[in-house]
């Protein structure tokens, strides 16, 4: 069995912890959700999924496609769903464990449609293309605080020309040795994804099932709908042993109640309906409890992700997932800023810290700007620094005989300093030590070129893209994997 990577993830609940709810409040959300799952129920558009629900005791209305899910099935599904599973990387040092109550991990945002590029001290936005996915994957492979890779942007140059989602599967796998999480899968193409992973394992389907280097995300449609695509991703993921992330994107005041507690009820109903479907399909199927839920800005007509409400909702979802014994995957490190600026730094720190202190198992949002529309590689490396600072805050202040340091205080005495102590020298890395954030005095900073953070981040991006080496895939195996993409392209073009 793979061991938890000591670098990947960070213990949340041993230092500073944020508890938003009492046990009674969590139960109240749960019982309200059980009412909603029976009245009005969930509209399930996929006939196969409706049949699975029906065969397992759900009331199904074939005229309206509404499924009513009784509480006993929810409880059964929660008992069957694993509280722990491994996300395998191509390089085993990048294996990460998703475990309820376990470590906190970070991954990049997905899926944007534009890139914010830093050119000659200015920012420009352009449509994202397949090469951007490859470059971001390489950058994430380097970033020590990005634990696995989620699809960050769309390959818009492939759209309408080939099997875009299949390209968006191989390109990340080939350009990072970390686990790949596909955020925009197509249900009818899941077999291609499975075959790509199987080809990586030399055609060994059982090995591909045991050690999934690939996982998928799907979103219910708020309020209270499971689309055909969402159902097929769940069903096929369960059957092929692919971990599946059921992630609600409710908007409070728009597609869910304006009250955040009410939004959590519809959110919970949507996610639990998907988890029940997975467990009815294959008992023990690996699932996340996911969230990209936020508020709807009634004045501006947007869904802000750099808001305190998003941070609170993500923190709340982490606690709901723990209540159910499930690993969680929540939005965080989010910003509505258009470029890597002061607003981005403020919003990303706030929306990262809240779910981290609640023990979310994965927080996704690194590199994201403009309400989730745009991705910036410079922002990604800045976020990598922010995560290191958040990890330090999560530790709190440990109190022990060693850290109370009475002997050191007595040894140094009155009016002296602790710089010369062997203990101080040995713990030179004990304080936070960001890579990019500047802590020099003004004169030293000016002498070094007076570079702002975005410039420093851009230089780091260029350095990584030029010099970082990703663990390669064997050429013959990569050829077999590419052949599956080519096959998907031919099918797309009707050839």
UniProtKB/Swiss-Prot annotation:
Protein name: Trimethylamine methyltransferase MttB
Keyword Cell inner membrane: no
GO biological process: methanogenesis; methylation
Pathway: One-carbon metabolism; methanogenesis from trimethylamine
Entry-linked Gene3D superfamilies: Trimethylamine methyltransferase-like
One Pfam family recorded for the sequence: MTTB
One function term, GO molecular function aspect: trimethylamine methyltransferase activity
EC number, UniProt record: 2.1.1.250
Function as written in the Swiss-Prot or TrEMBL entry: Catalyzes the transfer of a methyl group from trimethylamine to the corrinoid cofactor of MttC.
Disulfide bonds: none
Record family assignment: Belongs to the trimethylamine methyltransferase family.
Species whose genome carries this gene: Methanosarcina barkeri (strain Fusaro / DSM 804)
Keywords attached to this entry: Methanogenesis, Methyltransferase, Pyrrolysine, Transferase
Class in the EC hierarchy, top level: transferase
Tagged with keyword tRNA processing: no
Catalytic activity, as annotated: Co(I)-[trimethylamine-specific corrinoid protein] + trimethylamine + H(+) = methyl-Co(III)-[trimethylamine-specific corrinoid protein] + dimethylamine
């Amino acid at each position: 069995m793979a061991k938890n990577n000591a670098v990947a993830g960070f213990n949340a609940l041993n230092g500073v912890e944020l508890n938003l709810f009492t046990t009674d409040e969590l139960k109240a959300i749960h019982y309200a959700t059980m009412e909603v799952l029976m009245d009005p129920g969930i509209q399930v558009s996929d006939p196969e999924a409706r049949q699975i629900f029906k065969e397992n005791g759900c009331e199904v209305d074939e005229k309206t496609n509404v499924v009513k899910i009784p509480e006993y099935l929810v409880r059964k599904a929660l008992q069957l769903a694993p509280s722990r599973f491994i996300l395998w990387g191509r390089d085993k040092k990048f294996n990460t464990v998703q475990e309820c109550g376990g470590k906190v991990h970070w991954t990049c945002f997905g899926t944007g449609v534009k890139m914010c590029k830093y050119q000659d001290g200015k920012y420009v936005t352009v449509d994202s293309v397949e090469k951007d996915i490859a470059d971001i994957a390489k950058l994430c492979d380097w970033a020590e605080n990005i634990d696995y890779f989620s699809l960050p942007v769309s390959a818009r140059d492939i759209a309408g020309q080939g099997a875009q989602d299949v390209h968006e599967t191989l390109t990340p796998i080939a350009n990072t040795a970390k686990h790949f999480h596909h955020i925009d899968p197509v249900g009818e193409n899941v077999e291609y994804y499975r075959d790509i992973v199987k080809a990586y394992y030399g055609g060994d389907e059982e090995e591909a099932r045991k050690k999934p280097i690939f996982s998928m995300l799907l979103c219910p449609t708020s309020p209270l709908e499971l689309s055909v695509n969402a159902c097929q991703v769940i069903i096929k993921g369960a059957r092929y042993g692919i971990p599946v992330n059921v992630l609600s994107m409710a908007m409070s005041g728009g597609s869910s109640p304006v009250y955040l507690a009410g939004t959590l009820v519809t959110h919970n109903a949507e996610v639990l309906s998907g988890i029940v479907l997975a467990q009815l399909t294959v008992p023990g199927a690996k699932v996340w409890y996911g969230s990209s839920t936020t508020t709807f800005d009634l004045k501006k007509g947007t869904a802000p992700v750099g808001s305190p409400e998003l941070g609170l909702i993500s923190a709340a979802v982490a606690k709901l997932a723990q209540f159910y014994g499930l690993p969680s995957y929540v939005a965080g490190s989010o910003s509505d800023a258009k470029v890597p600026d002061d607003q981005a730094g403020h919003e990303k720190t706030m929306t990262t810290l809240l779910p981290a202190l609640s023990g979310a198992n994965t927080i996704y949002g690194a590199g994201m700007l403009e309400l989730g529309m745009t991705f910036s590689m410079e922002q990604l490396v800045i976020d990598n620094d922010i995560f290191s600072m958040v990890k330090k805050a999560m530790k709190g202040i440990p109190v022990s005989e060693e850290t109370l340091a009475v002997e050191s205080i007595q040894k140094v005495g009155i009016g002296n300093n602790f710089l010369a102590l062997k203990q101080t020298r040995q713990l030179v890395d004990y304080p936070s030590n960001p890579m990019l954030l500047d802590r020099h005095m003004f004169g030293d900073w000016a002498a070094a070129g007076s570079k702002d953070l975005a410039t420093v981040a851009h230089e780091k991006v260029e350095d990584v893209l030029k010099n970082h080496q990703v663990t390669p895939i064997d050429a013959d195996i990569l050829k077999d994997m590419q052949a599956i993409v080519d096959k998907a392209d031919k099918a797309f073009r009707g050839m």
